[in-house]
Swiss-Prot record:
Stored PROSITE patterns: HOMEOBOX_1, HOMEOBOX_2
Location in or out of the cell: Nucleus
The species this protein was found in: Heterodontus francisci (Horn shark)
Classification via Pfam families: Homeodomain
Coiled coil region boundaries: none
Classification of source organism: Eukaryota, Metazoa, Chordata, Craniata, Vertebrata
Keyword list, A-Z: Developmental protein, DNA-binding, Homeobox, Nucleus, Transcription, Transcription regulation
Stated name of the protein: Homeobox protein Hox-D12
Length: 272
């Protein structure tokens, strides 16, 4: 026969008629240091006396619930996930299940569910070719963005070319882009025609109209009389010689410059 240690958790639990040690840890040991006098008047141990000595496993046969918690020397367990004070957990512990294993299995089950949920939505680059893509869910703007080098095309996303809806969308987008380009840039085959709907890019130079001998003679006589003419005299010459006012003005300017060059040449020749 082995001695029953009063500090053994299994012995205390058997005296108090507890099926699991959770009520002894949490329900009866209060933070203010109250005793177990309400449930068992024979026990006069305080919280300090109980917590000062380490709990060791007894060689006696103890219930599986007390054997699972016989190695702990703490009065309070900080891990609230593995051990719960719920009544439902204590009922399962009485049936022979360990609550810490149950909660760890539950947490691992939640992790597996999260992994499955994340795998159900793969990235664009990891979409296998066997995935059936419903073409009715995708509109033509998605196809256009993929044609213009969108992120789906950069990440290696390949459209199913066998689907007729996608092929029709590609053809329509290509034809639309070609029609827009043709409307923006009009075609002009001949630039020298000078047509109103296709103006020439380079402005053609006006053909020079030479002066007649009669016009030159009249202008020379007027220049010998007066090198500088006013507006009224210029108007009379233009009307008489059938010339524009601008032509008369330019001819007088050129004639003055010609006379100046002749004078400078005579001066240079006289020096030598």
């Amino acid at each position: 026969m082995c001695e029953h240690n009063l500090l053994n958790s299994g012995y205390v639990g058997s005296l108090l008629n507890f099926t699991s040690p959770e009520p002894f840890y949490f329900a009866n040991l209060r933070p203010n240091g109250t005793q177990l006098a309400t449930l068992s008047p024979a026990l006069s141990y305080t919280r300090r006396d109980v917590c000062s000595l380490p709990w060791t496993s007894s060689p006696c046969a103890s219930p599986p619930q007390s054997r699972a918690f016989s190695g702990y020397s703490q009065s309070y367990l900080s891990n609230s996930v593995s051990i719960s004070i719920n009544r439902h957990v204590s009922d399962k512990a009485a049936a022979g299940e360990e609550p810490n294993k149950y909660y760890f299995q539950d947490s691992s089950r939640k992790v597996e569910e999260r992994c499955r949920h994340n795998q159900s939505y793969p990235s664009d680059a990891s979409i296998p070719s066997s995935v059936n893509i419903n073409p009715a869910k995708y509109e033509y703007p998605n196809v256009e963005t993929s044609l213009h080098g969108s992120s789906l095309h950069n990440q290696g996303f390949e459209l199913n070319s066998n689907s007729p809806t996608v092929n029709d969308g590609i053809k329509q987008s290509v034809s639309l882009s070609m029609s827009l380009q043709s409307s923006v840039t009009p075609v002009c085959n001949r630039s020298s025609d000078g047509l109103p709907w296709c103006p020439t890019q380079v402005r053609s130079r006006r053909k020079r109209k030479p002066y007649t001998k009669q016009q030159i003679a009249e202008l020379e006589n007027e220049f010998l009389a007066n090198e500088f003419i006013n507006r009224q005299k210029r108007k009379e010459l233009s009307d008489r010689l059938n010339l524009s006012d601008q032509q008369v003005k330019i001819w007088f300017q050129n004639r003055r410059m010609k006379k100046k060059r002749l004078v400078m040449r005579e001066q240079t020749l006289s020096l030598f």
